[in-house]
């Protein structure tokens, strides 16, 4: 269709029709969940590799094993907002994490974490005492604070990061 035809059609649109289109667009924009990244500032160091953490996300859903509802903090060097927004399952939320750390809360007396570097070619999992996290905000919709630990004695990473993560996704499937 030539561009002139499109312009003529738009000009001939009745004002109430244009208002309906605008209202529909606004309704869609408001109803779509946005996985906007929170801020993170710090690093994860593992042997000779370092990742600068810049993005923080908080997601909520069932644990893959226990099916118990947990919160997962994802700290990443790269923006994975679009990937998290597209997730239908909890296990998907950190599957595209290539440089960073995910930490599971509410699943027991210790924090479970998974560190990845170099496009997931380097991975390390461990557990930590909850005391390594000092929160300044911790409720159903937001977690903020400082996360510092040194797991190098066990062959793991050293992490020092300050973050502020809003809840970006709630899931019902593990």
Regions found by a protein language model. Name each.
Residues 32-36:
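Sec/Tat signal peptide C-region and signal peptidase I cleavage site
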Residues 63-140:
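Surface-exposed helix/loop patches within compact recognition domains
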Residues 4-22:
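Bacterial N-terminal signal peptides that target proteins for export
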Residues 37-58:
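Charge-rich, low-complexity N-terminal segments
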Residues 38-39, 43, 146-174:
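Edge beta-strand at a domain terminus
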Residues 49-50, 123-129, 157-162:
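Amphipathic hydrophobic-ligand
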Residues 139-147:
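A short hydrophobic beta-strand element
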Residues 19-31:
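Bacterial N-terminal signal peptides
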């Amino acid at each position: 269709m030539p561009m002139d035809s499109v312009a003529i059609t738009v000009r001939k649109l009745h004002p109430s029709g244009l208002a309906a289109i605008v209202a529909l667009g606004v309704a869609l924009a408001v109803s779509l969940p946005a996985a906007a990244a929170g801020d993170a500032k710090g690093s994860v160091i593992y042997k000779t590799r370092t990742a600068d953490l810049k993005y923080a996300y908080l997601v909520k859903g069932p644990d893959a094993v226990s099916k118990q509802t947990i919160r997962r903090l994802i700290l990443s060097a790269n923006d994975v907002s679009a990937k998290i927004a597209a997730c239908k399952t909890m296990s998907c939320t950190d599957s595209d994490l290539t440089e960073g750390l995910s930490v599971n809360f509410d699943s027991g007396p210790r924090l479970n974490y998974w560190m990845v570097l170099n496009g997931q070619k380097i991975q390390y999992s461990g557990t930590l005492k909850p005391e390594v996290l000092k929160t300044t905000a911790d409720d159903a919709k937001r977690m903020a604070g400082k996360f510092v630990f040194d797991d190098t004695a066990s062959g793991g990473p050293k992490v020092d990061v300050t973050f502020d993560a809003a809840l970006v996704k709630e899931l019902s499937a593990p």
